Each structure stands twice: as C-alpha cells, then as structure tokens.
Swiss-Prot record:
It catalyses: (6R)-10-formyltetrahydrofolate + 5-amino-1-(5-phospho-beta-D-ribosyl)imidazole-4-carboxamide = 5-formamido-1-(5-phospho-D-ribosyl)imidazole-4-carboxamide + (6S)-5,6,7,8-tetrahydrofolate; IMP + H2O = 5-formamido-1-(5-phospho-D-ribosyl)imidazole-4-carboxamide. This is Bifunctional purine biosynthesis protein PurH. The IMP cyclohydrolase activity resides in the N-terminal region. GO terms for molecular function: IMP cyclohydrolase activity; phosphoribosylaminoimidazolecarboxamide formyltransferase activity. Keywords: Hydrolase, Multifunctional enzyme, Purine biosynthesis, Transferase. It comes from Vibrio cholerae serotype O1 (strain ATCC 39541 / Classical Ogawa 395 / O395). GO terms for cellular component: cytosol. One of its GO terms (biological process) is 'de novo' IMP biosynthetic process. Belongs to the PurH family. The keyword Hydrolase applies.
C-alpha cells in the first residue's frame, strides 16, 4: 500500500515570513492551490501568486481585528477530514480537503522579551487559530502535512519532486512531531509568562510582589546527541540544548575533530569554559571532574597554559583545557607534546593549531566563538520528586566592593591575587579553598566536608608540586566558621585571605588573621557550588 499523499491544496498563514514567498512559488509551480490569510495572503498576492483568501473560501469574513479568521468548519473539516472515511460528509457540506498546512505562530516570546511589553501586548500575541490548525493537521498526519519550521520548506519540495508531488507517511509523521513540539513550547512560554504575574508565595515569601518564577515551570530542550552512556557506563544518556542557546557555550560549540563528546566531557567542558570567561587577560583553565585543577593568567596563551599546568600536573592528565583567546599553534603543540587531554576549547582555533592537534585524532577540539556578556537564564537541578530552579551565579565583586577587616592592609600584589583567586574559587566545588600567587593558582582544595581540610589539601598540593606558598593569597567560597582554617593557612605561609564573612565567629577569625599578621578581606558574597 502506497502511503504517500499528493499535495493538491495548501493553507499558508505565517507570522515569520522567512522563505514563505519562495516556498509558495515552488508549491504553485507544482500545481498546488494556495489558501491564505491576512498579511500572508497580501504578501503572496503582491508577488504575483494566485491566492484564495480563507474568508472567500469559507464565505465568512475575518472579524474582531483578525482574532477570528480560520476557526471555521470548512477550514478544520478540510484539515481533519479522514480521506476515504469522511468524504461523504465533506461533500455534503462543501468542504474541500486541505492537504498541507503551513503555519507558524504569533511572536509571543519576542513580544514579552521587550521590557516595555504590557499585559495587553502579551495577550494580543497569543495565537489561537494558528495552534488550532497546527494541532488539527498534526492529529491527521495520516492524510495531511503540517509545516511549522521554515527550515523544512526545501525538504518538503525535494520530497514532492521525488514522489510525484506527494509526501510519505514517514515525512508527515516527522513533521507532526515537530508541530506538537512547536505548540508545546509555545503554550509553555505563555504559561511561564502568566505564571510570573501572580504574587510570590511559600514559607519564605511575603507580600504581593510578582515572582520571576512561574507557578508551573515549562522548559523545552532539543536533543542534540545520543550518548554511549551517561556519567557511568550503566546509565543511558543524551544531550539536550535550548531552542535558542546562547553563543559561546558547549551547547553551540563547533567540534573540529575528535571522538564524540561524552556526558562527562560536556559537563567538564562547561565548567572549564564558564570559569575562563571570568578573565579579561589571556587565561587558561584546566578542569578535572568538574573542578579546576589549574588556572593561570599569562602574557599570552602559552604562558597561561604552562602556568596552569604547573598547578597540578597529575590531575591535569586526561583533563579539559579552556582558553579565552584564539588557540595558536605554539600553545597547541605544547599541550599535545606534554599531556593526554580529553577536550580543548577556545573561542577561536587557528589553522596552525588545527593541523597540530590533528596528530592526536581522538582529542576533541572545540571552537565556541566569542562571548559578549554574561550568560542569562536559570540553573536547574533535579531532586527526587522535584526541580530546584535558581538564577545563575553571575555575582562577582570588584575592588571597590571589598572590605578590609584586618589590621594590616593587603599589598597591591596581594589585592590583585585576591581578586584572581576569588574568581577561581567561584568554580570550585564547596567547600572550596584556592591558594594563588602571581595570577596563578598554586593549590586548590575542593569538595571537602570541612573547610579546614580543603585548606590543608590546597597546601599539600602546592607542596607536592614544589610551589612556594609563602606570600600567597587564600580564597574561600564561604565564611570560616572557626579560626582553624586561618591557622592552617598561616602555617602554610598564606599572608592574605579573601572570604565572604558573615560567620557568628567573624571576630574570632579576624583576630586569628591579626595574630598571624595576615590581611583579611571580606567580599560580602558567597559562592557555594554543589
């Protein structure tokens, strides 16, 4: 049985008119009768195409400023009518079959993204007839093709040419899936927007202020990649990306060479890239198991890489390396000749670097593009039975935000290193301690249940690599609950500490710093990372 369906009549009604004229001309050239509405009909007519307006087809005018156009039995009967089963009813009521529906919806997302958008503006951009036609056509995909994406126009024409102006059931089914995805995302955006207009509520909220978090949280992600396995080999996994992901991310990066990215590769590459974005000077970040194990600045990338590698060469083995400048051939050669690396990512990769890395075919080389500003949106974390949603941690202090609470003032060099290692600490798993000196991390203590042990580990790592701690700065992602962390740092040779402050025992901690002759800086900002 031939499951292809010929396309004799198509209804076109689009808000985004990208490519619609060319598509309509291609349909007309293949003998397809065109029905259309409003602005789409006018545009096609202006281009010399023969178009029947839906109002002429139904005998019922558009009304209420265009709110009612296609909600008519002759339209939906033509779309929903089952060929071979509903033909008699359709003939009785003068309903002609519509074989293809080409619809995209009012620009609700763009409208509400405008900071000057009013509720009235939002309401007028809620499409009613469009989603109804889309769902009708998708439901009846056995007989009707629904096209909601402009990037499918060429595909449809190619298949029609290959199948005597017909589309196969497989194609119609795939287009129907895209249609349901389209309307689901659209309705989710509307629900999210209206859900933020109600008062905040919960045990920690008071008053009637609006909430940035909707009553129900709707998010749609598009599958980019199936994976061999997830975090562990017994876990199945896939990688999904946002419908319109921001540039300069692991989600949008171009893979130049190497094996497919694994689940852990993606997570670690994201951690490395987001950390290196914090720095304006040439920087290198090396990540292992989602924690920075080497971070440094330099006069150029080669110097930054050499210094970052020096932080912890053992952990750098099999790590992820991120840069904030174009990867040059000299730096690429230093990496390939020195260590095993899983992923290298940079905003741009020179041809010389590409040629050098090609000698190691399994190394994943990514080019992410330049970043223009901070990443927006929410961070999501699944818990059993729920979802935690929060703003991304975009907080960062400047020099003017710092409060020196010790008797001794930090030197200019200490202050510079304090700001450097504070940025690094933001990306280290809590409890996080970072030792730094001369724009280079010399010891990183991550993920310990007690802060003092993170401090001890940072000192041990520095000592293991022969890095001099004396005169270094220590950053802590959260306050010190006791003085023991300060005592451990002083014993290691730390002379300046930067931390949020805010402990009930702050004075005890400050007193410890003063006893050791250390400078202590409060940021007033915490950077827990779990």
């Amino acid at each position: 049985m031939n499951n292809a369906r010929p396309i004799h009549r198509a209804l076109l009604s689009v808000s985004d008119k990208t490519g619609i004229v060319e598509f309509a001309k291609a349909l007309a050239e293949r003998g397809v009768e065109l029905l259309s509405t409003g602005g789409t009909a006018r545009l096609l007519a202006e281009q010399g195409l023969t178009v029947t307006e839906v109002s002429d087809y139904t005998g019922f005018p558009e009304m209420m400023d265009g709110r009612v156009k296609t909600l008519h039995p002759k339209v939906h009967g033509g779309i929903l009518g089952r060929r071979g089963q509903d033909d008699a009813v359709m003939n009785t009521h003068g309903i002609q079959p519509i074989d293809m529906v080409v619809v995209n919806l009012y620009p609700f997302a763009q409208t509400v993204a405008n900071p000057n958008c009013t509720l009235a503006d939002a309401v007028e951009n809620i499409d009613i007839g469009g989603p109804t036609m889309v769902r009708s056509a998708a439901k009846n995909h056995k007989d009707v093709a629904i096209v909601v994406n402009a990037h499918d126009y060429d595909r449809v024409i190619r298949e029609m040419d290959a199948n005597h102006n017909s589309l196969t059931l497989a194609t119609r089914f795939d287009l129907a899936i895209a249609a349901f995805e389209h309307t689901a995302a659209y309705d989710g955006m509307i629900a999210n927007y209206f859900g933020t207009l109600v008062p905040s509520y919960g045990d920690n909220k008071e008053g009637d202020e609006e909430s940035k978090f909707p009553r129900t949280f709707n998010a749609q992600f598009i599958k980019k990649q199936d994976m061999r396995y997830g975090e562990n080999s017994h876990q199945a996994a896939a990688f999904y990306v946002e419908a319109n992901p921001q540039e300069a991310s692991v989600a949008t990066a171009r893979q130049i060479q190497g094996k497919a990215l694994s689940y852990n590769n993606i997570a670690d590459t994201d951690a490395a890239l987001e950390c290196v974005k914090e720095f304006s000077e040439p920087a290198c970040v090396i990540v292992k198991h989602a924690n920075p194990c080497g971070v440094a600045l330099g006069d150029d990338l080669l110097q930054a890489y050499n210094r970052a590698y020096q932080t912890d060469p053992t952990s750098a083995f099999g790590g992820i390396i991120a840069f904030n400048r174009e990867l040059d051939g000299e730096t690429a050669r230093a990496i390939i000749e020195r260590q095993f690396v899983e992923v290298i990512i940079a905003p741009k990769v020179s041809q010389a670097a590409i040629d050098i890395v090609a000698a190691k075919q399994n190394v994943r080389l990514l080019e992410c593009g330049e970043w223009q500003g901070q990443t927006t949106g929410f961070d999501l974390k699944r818990v059993n039975g729920g979802l935690l949603v929060q703003d991304r941690d975009q907080g960062m202090v400047a020099q003017d935000d710092l409060q020196v609470v010790s008797t001794r003032q930090p030197s200019d060099a200490e202050l510079k290193d304090a700001l450097f290692c504070w940025k690094v600490a933001k990306y280290v798993k809590s409890n996080a301690i970072v030792y730094a000196k001369g724009d280079m991390a010399i010891g990183i203590g991550a993920g310990q249940m007690s802060r003092v042990y993170s401090a001890k580990i940072a000192g041990i790592k520095a000592a293991d690599e022969g890095l001099e701690v004396a005169g270094s700065v220590m950053a802590s992602d959260a306050f010190f609950p006791f003085r023991d962390g300060i005592d451990a740092a002083a014993e290691a040779g730390i002379t300046c500490v930067i931390q949020p402050g805010g402990s009930m025992r702050d004075q005890e901690v400050i007193d410890a710093a003063n006893e050791h002759g250390m400078a202590m800086i409060f940021t007033g900002m915490r950077h827990f990372r779990h």
